[in-house]
Design a protein with these regions (language model features):
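Extended aliphatic helical segments
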Residues: 43, 47, 53, 57, ...
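Predominantly the C-terminal beta-signal and adjacent terminal strand-loop region
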Residues: 201-249
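Outer-membrane pore/translocation modules
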Residues: 39, 54-185, 193-199, 219-227, ...
């Protein structure tokens, strides 16, 4: 088990042995979105870990989960509105002389994402992806491209094996660009962008973190605007802001 204590480490591309942090991992007790009248405030949290199979083989298995908890919705017993489950496996290709400023590394993988709900709220998709990335000093540029594995759209609407969301890429596009930059005094800004030029839809997200209480914790500001913040509402434009704490960034 490894938690990066270096304040300038990027968890996504860190090559720690065994179990380690992966994507942003945070707890945001206070978030606000005007998209959900009567339930504007939700607790948003994510968990994300990866496991390297062997020190000499850069094969990783990873699991990420993002949850939306309506902690203030007492009239409905404070439900979890949505959980998104995201297991994946990927192989990391890195040049031997990775210290050179011009080097590119690449992740090649397969991932599944679903929300575990029953019809008509079930959402899921599977993707093959390639993600070249450039990392030098205090900058990381990670550009992920994917191909969705086709599902059967001809099955009846009540069949759970039917494609739940055949148009999801109209809202997510086929690529995501992530840029992370270390700033002064170990502050960090992380932004991500998705866009489909055919439909004109996409999203932009931002996470700003500063060193917080204790080693490995960071005060966090979160902002998102666009589509597919969650699978359930992939086709609804959402604007959300939130504050909390992170352990991976």
């Amino acid at each position: 088990w490894s938690i990066a204590t270096d304040l300038d480490t990027f968890a996504l591309t860190a090559d720690a042995r065994g179990l380690s942090l992966h994507k942003p991992m945070y707890l945001l007790p206070g978030t606000y979105s005007g998209r959900y009248p009567g339930n504007n405030s939700e607790v948003l949290f994510s968990v994300s870990l990866k496991f390297r199979v062997h020190k000499s083989v850069p094969l990783y298995f990873a699991y990420s989960q993002k949850s939306y908890f309506q902690a203030l919705n007492g009239s409905q017993s404070k439900p979890f509105r949505e959980n998104n489950f995201n297991p994946e496996a990927f192989f990391r290709l890195k040049p031997k002389r990775a210290e050179k400023w011009w080097y590119l590394a690449t992740d090649i993988g397969i991932e599944h994402e679903s929300n575990g709900q029953s019809l008509p709220d079930s959402r899921s998709w599977d993707r093959l992806y390639i993600a070249p990335y450039w990392q030098h000093g205090k900058t990381l540029v990670y550009w992920k491209w994917w191909w969705r594995i086709p599902e059967d759209q001809k099955r009846p609407p009540t069949d759970p094996k039917r494609d739940d969301n055949p148009d999801i890429q109209d809202y997510t596009g086929y690529t995501e660009l992530k840029i992370q930059q270390q700033l002064f005094k170990h502050h960090q800004i992380s932004s991500n962008f998705r866009f489909n030029p055919t439909t004109g839809r996409g999203s932009a997200g931002l996470i700003y973190t500063v060193p917080g209480p204790g080693d490995g914790f960071f005060w966090t500001f979160y902002a998102f605007n666009g589509y597919a913040e969650s699978l359930l509402d992939y086709d609804r434009s959402v604007t959300r802001v939130g504050v909390g704490i992170s352990v991976a960034r």
